[in-house]
């Protein structure tokens, strides 16, 4: 069921057989211990069981056509999985789904190099890497050490950093699943950015920095939202969520995707990726949620910006490599692009070339996960854990998997 406009307006206004690694069983406060003080007691709410069938239906999680037995050469029932966990009782919660599999927990402590060094002794025996928390398990040294590795479960939607961590991953040697459909908070970031730029609220904020109150020069912005056309480039999980929200605000939505012309009812037209040059001129707002692949690198250049409707808004939550930054800067300065907003989401952070400080540009740091959950709401993180636990059960049983990435074929 789609969200109503009132829902959107309200949105805008406003957790046995296991081995413990990195001392997660204690999880005492490190600074307090260092000072000799007793660790403060921590009370964690019980981990909800979750309803995986409801999750599949709500987010449209895609089940693989083949089973794990069919997709993984020489598949055997796993004996051990290496799991990056978020809390000390997470392992027991996961163990209920795979009672005959040894689970080894890892948790972030120290530098990335120290984390890898502590995990290395366990990697050699791991049949699977399951990660939803730091430390990242998708590290080249760990992959090389994991001689029995057959399956990797990553939590994120942007899996290019994992894909590029190892030639074996890029070649599709391992079964790879991710959390691409469970990233509604990223879509909320895009929605907020879009509304901010359409209503020129960014100019109002900058007014607060001036010595006196003065009405901003809105130029050609301060738009009415209803009736405008949004083009979503990359109709995956994030793009679909944004399209739903924009439709609820009264916008017309068109989109592109690499796989097919199929899309939800709230999208008027879904074109293939090669239709982007023809569709981009129809949009008042262009929102990019496409993956970073060799095919998408630099796709938004001077020629593509020239095809946009003059004064249209450009926003992106994708990797910076999709955008030729000097070309975007030139388009903003000339007025061809009326305003632009995007995230700095790969490290180390940098000032985008030619864009930093421009009055019609909104730049944010990457904040894909919510900082504060709504009281009583099931968090995105818990939904991700429910999906990953189900995949652990399915892989162990050799069944069809959820959210399989076709890295060798499509790059994501």
Language-model features: where?
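Phosphate-binding beta-alpha-beta segment of Rossmann-like dinucleotide-binding domains, i.e.
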Residues: 168-229, 403-404
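Bacterial N-terminal signal peptides
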Residues: 14-26
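Rossmann-like adenosine-cofactor binding region
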Residues: 258-354
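C-terminal helix-to-coil terminal segments
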Residues: 36-72, 176-189, 203, 207, ...
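Rossmann-fold dehydrogenase core element
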Residues: 167-182, 309-313, 330-346, 356-372
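An N-terminal-biased, well-structured beta-alpha scaffold segment characteristic
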Residues: 38-176
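N-terminal Rossmann-fold NAD(P) dinucleotide-binding loop
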Residues: 239-240
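Glycine-rich Rossmann-fold phosphate-binding loop(s) that bind the pyrophosphate
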Residues: 235-236
């Amino acid at each position: 069921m789609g969200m109503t406009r009132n829902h959107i307006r309200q949105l805008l206004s406003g957790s046995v057989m296991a081995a413990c690694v990195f001392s997660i069983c204690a999880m005492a406060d490190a600074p307090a211990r260092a000072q000799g003080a007793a660790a403060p007691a921590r009370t964690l709410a019980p981990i909800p069981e979750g309803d995986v069938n409801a999750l599949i239906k709500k987010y449209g999680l895609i089940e693989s056509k083949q089973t794990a037995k069919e997709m993984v050469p020489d598949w055997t029932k796993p004996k051990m999985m290496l799991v990056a966990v978020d809390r000390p009782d997470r392992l027991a919660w996961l163990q209920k789904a795979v009672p005959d599999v040894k689970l080894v927990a890892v948790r972030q402590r120290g530098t990335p190099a120290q984390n890898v060094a502590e995990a290395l002794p366990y990697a050699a025996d791991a049949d699977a890497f399951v990660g939803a928390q730091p430390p990242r398990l998708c590290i080249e040294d760990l992959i090389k050490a994991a001689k029995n590795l057959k399956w990797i479960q990553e939590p994120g939607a942007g899996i290019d950093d994992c894909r590029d961590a190892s030639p074996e991953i890029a070649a599709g040697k391992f079964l790879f699943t991710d959390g691409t459909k469970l990233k509604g908070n990223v879509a909320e970031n895009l929605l907020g950015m879009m509304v901010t730029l359409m209503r020129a609220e960014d100019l109002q904020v900058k007014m607060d920095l001036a010595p006196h109150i003065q009405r901003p020069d809105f130029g050609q912005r301060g738009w009415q939202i209803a009736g405008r056309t949004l083009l979503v480039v990359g109709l995956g999980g994030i793009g679909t969520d944004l399209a739903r929200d924009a439709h609820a605000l009264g916008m017309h939505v068109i989109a592109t995707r690499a796989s097919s012309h199929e899309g939800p009812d709230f999208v008027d037209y879904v074109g293939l990726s090669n239709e982007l040059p023809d569709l981009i001129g129809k949009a008042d707002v262009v929102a990019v949620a496409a993956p970073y692949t060799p095919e998408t690198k630099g796709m938004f250049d001077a020629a593509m910006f020239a095809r946009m409707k003059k004064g249209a808004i450009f926003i992106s939550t994708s990797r910076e490599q999709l955008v030729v930054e000097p070309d975007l800067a030139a388009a903003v300065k000339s007025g061809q692009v009326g305003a632009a907003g995007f995230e700095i989401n790969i490290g180390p952070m940098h000032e985008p070339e030619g864009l930093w400080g421009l009055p019609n540009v909104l730049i944010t740091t990457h904040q894909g996960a919510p900082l504060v959950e709504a009281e009583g709401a099931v968090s995105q993180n818990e939904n991700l854990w429910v999906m990953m636990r189900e995949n652990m059960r399915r892989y162990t049983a050799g069944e069809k998997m959820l959210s399989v990435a076709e890295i060798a074929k499509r790059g994501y």
